[in-house]
Each structure stands twice: as structure tokens, then as C-alpha cells.
Amino acid sequence: MMKTSVMFMLVVVISLMCSSEAQEVARTYCGRDLADTLADLCFGVEKRGVAQYAPYFWTRQYLGSRGKRGVVDECCFRPCTLDVLLSYCG
């Protein structure tokens, strides 16, 4: 009986942790707030080398609307998540 209760509580705690991570809140980041958040998120992220950009020059015409917008368009003019901001690191 005790083992079942502990197991049930463990399952409940794990599922609550997973659901809270999946529900990341989108918000707007503008000005200094945007710059500071990007600096904090991107600290230690490896910079991309020139070789990694080579395909970019050949496929630029095939990029979706994301290739035409910037971080301000995506995160200041409308809410975005930290995952979107992380995509601008490097």
C-alpha cells in the first residue's frame, strides 16, 4: 500500500513538472529588456563560423517569412517565448 502511494505521488509530481515546462509563457521583449534577455540567454553559446553560413547564401530565396523578420519583429511587436529568443543566439 505504501509503495503504491509513493509511486502515485512520484507520477503526479513528474507529470506536473512536465506540463509546467510545456506551457512556456510568451511575452514581449523590447529595448533594454530584449538586449539584456538575449545577452543572458546567449552567454556561452558558441558563435557560428563562416562555413556554417555557406548554405544560407544559396538557399536564402527559399527561406520562409522568418528569414525576412528579425528578433524585434518576432519578440517586441508580438509576444514570443524564450525558445524563439534562443534561436537568435550564435
Curated annotation (Swiss-Prot):
SUPFAM superfamilies: Insulin-like. One of its GO terms (molecular function) is insulin-like growth factor receptor binding. Residues 1-20 form the signal peptide. Disulfide bonds join 30-76, 42-89, 75-80. Residues 49-67 form a propeptide. Gene3D superfamilies: Insulin-like. The keyword Iron does not apply. InterPro entries: Bombyxin, Bombyxin_B, Insulin-like, Insulin-like_sf, Insulin_CS, Insulin_family. It is found in: Secreted. Keywords: Cleavage on pair of basic residues, Disulfide bond, Hormone, Secreted, Signal. Belongs to the insulin family. Heterodimer of a B chain and an A chain linked by two disulfide bonds. Silk worm has two kinds of PTTH: 4K-PTTH and 22K-PTTH; there are many forms of 4K-PTTH. Brain peptide responsible for activation of prothoracic glands to produce ecdysone in insects. This is Bombyxin B-6. It comes from Bombyx mori.
